[in-house]
């Protein structure tokens, strides 16, 4: 028993060491391609729904200086009638298409949900709807007591209509916002804050969301078969080494350690078996990006309609973030892993086939991370151009987030060798494009995340984080980045031997009993 425990500990240390080594900062790391959140129309729920599991972390991570939180009950008729009023105001401040983005976070909490009872009591909620105003960090770190003087969190006592709520906010901020304010004079204009590097931090939440949803789809839709099992292993290995989220790297490592237990080589799942497997993965705390993910909503990738952007946007951001975090020696294997993953597990048939055709058209192996990053960027633009035409003909696109050639000239003038575009073809300066991706989706995406959201969510894991940090420090040596994946790959050979031995021990114990 003691030997088995030691062996398991050693294996986990090896996997985490590989992930820590491979995830060590590189000068050309962490960039992606994507778009910012934009809730859009009133019925698109501009306000962000929060609950007790993510309330503190989300508000602590908020970049806005102010927040309004509505506490309501879903069964309350007055709350249902009030929702359109609250959404009208939320539409002004939340998201890329907002008239006044980056000023106020508009959120909601359902106090009728059992998980939120203590949270609502913490803020002395005694009627519905109940609105509070204050700095997001104060919501995250304190409670509200109506008897307490000089409280930075204030009760909004006159916000029963959209007009009255906005008037209260205007009085508080000494502003003159109007419900008629619009973000764009032209719907194709680039948002004023699109080049703000502070906005990119929210992309990391959607990378986690896309990662968790991808695994959920694999389990629920029984897409894993014996023939594509290895491609999932290879993709998880990339996530262990290169995922921009530390929690997702750790979760991927845990899944790989227990891979044979959950997905045997002859596994073929029925729908019921897939649901049971999803439950078993959750019960054993193998949530790939944390137990509160998927959260069920998008930030950076939120569209103005419920059916636009979202998962596909998040998946693109994930793939781009992987390609720019690898070492040169990993470029070809990463390319193969991404292509195989989309081919085997992306369930949009037309998109899957089209992407794999572009993968198959590559004639020479990739030699550098730069080559792979630019190929994926070019591929993404080709997909956008194809979808732009289809969505225009069918009227199915997102009116506030039309497909565009990326990056637009407003964001990266140096990316264009000439301001003239001939027959839709752009004369790109690829060196500038790559540098743009490095700068726009670089260290800010990960560093801001670590300083805010991650710190809050991982308070309960201080011991684990401390051990992981020690491993990372011990493993930080000037070795080529490819060694990270090499170590991870070798580790899984040891894992297989270890788990086979453990399974034999389990059978013996059963016989003994």
UniProtKB/Swiss-Prot annotation:
Which residues catalyse the reaction? 76 (nucleophile), 79 (nucleophile)
Query: Where along this sequence does the record place binding of FAD?
Result: 309, 316, 320, 350, 354, 377-384, 403, 406
GO CC, sorted alphabetically, is: extracellular space; Golgi membrane
Cell compartment(s), UniProt = Secreted
GO biological process terms, alphabetically, are: protein folding
Q: Does the keyword Disulfide bond apply?
A: yes
* Purpose of the protein: Catalyzes the oxidation of sulfhydryl groups in peptide and protein thiols to disulfides with the reduction of oxygen to hydrogen peroxide. May contribute to disulfide bond formation in a variety of secreted proteins.
What's the name of the protein? Sulfhydryl oxidase 1
Report the source organism.
Oryza sativa subsp. japonica (Rice)
Whichever gene encodes this chain, its name is QSOX1
